[in-house]
Amino acid sequence: MSQAGEKSRVPAENGLVSPGRVFQFQCLMSTAKAFLPEDFLLSTEWARTLYFEHAAKQPIFDYHCHLPPDQIANNRQFENLFQVWLAGDHYKWRAMRTNGVPEDLVTGKNTSDYDKFFAWAKTVPYTLRNPLYHWSHLELRRYFGICEIINEQTAPKIWEIANAKLRTPELSVHGILTKNRVNVICTTDDPVDDLAHHIAIKKTKLETRVYPTFRPDKALWVNNPAGFNAWIDQLTARSNIDVRDLNSFLSALKNRHDFFHSLGARVSDHGLENIPDVECTESEAKTIFDAARAGTAATPEQVNKFTWFMMLFFGRIDADAGWTKQLHLGAIRNNNTRLLKRVGADVGVDSIGDFPQARGLTRYLDRLDSESKLPKTVIYNLNPADNYVFATAIGNVQDGTIPGKIQFGSGWWFLDQKEGMEWQINALSQLGLLSRFVGMLTDSRSFVSYVRHEYFRRLLCSMIGKDVENGLIPADRALVGGMIENICYKNAQNYFGLETGKL
């Protein structure tokens, strides 16, 4: 139903419309803004100026995402709206399940794409005040020119219009990246990946620069010998190093790190519950490694020790190579055994953990710093209770070599929404230097998620604009506008040291 149709509904009493209530309702509607107006989130003149004259003009530097490299290499032309919008989007899947949608209409293999899309369209009206409501409508507008409110009634028309536009070159993968002026993408890649798709991307005419990111989470799986050993077999084959002991294991990982570097990678990433507050000698690490290779699962204490040992190793090789390390800390993953067995991992059944973060993280950063082996590092918390912990941790080990060497990352995952981003921006502002912040990333598997950069930029300009209007920040366009441009793009461009496209 269109917005006009929604406005025509008038409250009734006993089945009859009260004239007084008609007048009252019409007055109420006349004072309401249109949904998603041009100045969405921009409530002051300064906010509008900062956004339209500074933020919106910046290209995108997407330094962390989960976009599939094969689809970039092949310049995929999506078959329909479900494929580009819903396939793989666990944010939407989670909302659909909460809305009572059966799993067959969420991830079912024997259900048509249209039926799953229609189930999502029926869910959208129930996502009011969830960021999915804003993101979904922004995506429809920015990519397809569809201003309709999506619901059960408008779904067929939206499906038809979107699918027609998806057949055009402008909405191929390369077209989408060009339209959004995405200058850099850093994907998320396993060390055993052959990176063939990244090699293929370099041979295309795509202006966006696409780099792999080294994500060695499986190197810590000593509590899962079957998975650990299967992965080491792949590591052995890919590195041509026979992994028989801890030393050869580290050599094989360094070999893959070097290979990633040769293809332009300058960023690593780790997803952990926390950095353990333990110590581990090389002898202890060897014992734990050998036991896992022999099929004996490590105890929780041993997992913590091995994690500490390996994370120091990864930090040192990142520092030696001039890379940036990312630490995503605090998730409890795959919390639904039923869906894990049926659908697999990473399907929208993860949540925020309450793990101790402060001591292990600060000791880790300090240890590497004391060895002169601390790389540039971006830390992300998932539990908002840790905002001030992380915002203060970054200040302990700044060494004066580059601005903002240790970064408090943008609101991650469940915090990637209006309130969560405001919390992160405010914590960083109060306890660090917001002006040196490297800004937003999509962290997404969807090519139409670049509206999240728009969302972040509008929110940032809203917050800073209000401060200017209230006399908390000087009304200096060069000073404030420059800060906005830096946060939205230029800081990341300078920080990560990657060659960028020129979109």
Task: Give short role names for the model-derived ranges.
Residues 28-321, 373-375, 379-391, 395-503:
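Metal-cofactor-binding active-site regions of metalloenzymes
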Residues 325-327:
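C-terminal amphipathic alpha-helical interaction region
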Residues 354-361:
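Divalent-cation-assisted or electrostatically stabilized phosphate/pyrophosphate-binding catalytic cores
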Residues 7-8, 14:
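Polybasic, lysine-rich low-complexity intrinsically disordered segments
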Residues 340-352:
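Active-site loop ensemble at the mouth of alpha/beta enzyme cores that anchors a bound cofactor
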Residues 13, 18-25:
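Short, positively charged and aromatic/hydrophobic N-terminal segments
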Residues 1-2, 8-9, 19-21:
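Short, low-complexity, intrinsically disordered N-terminal modules
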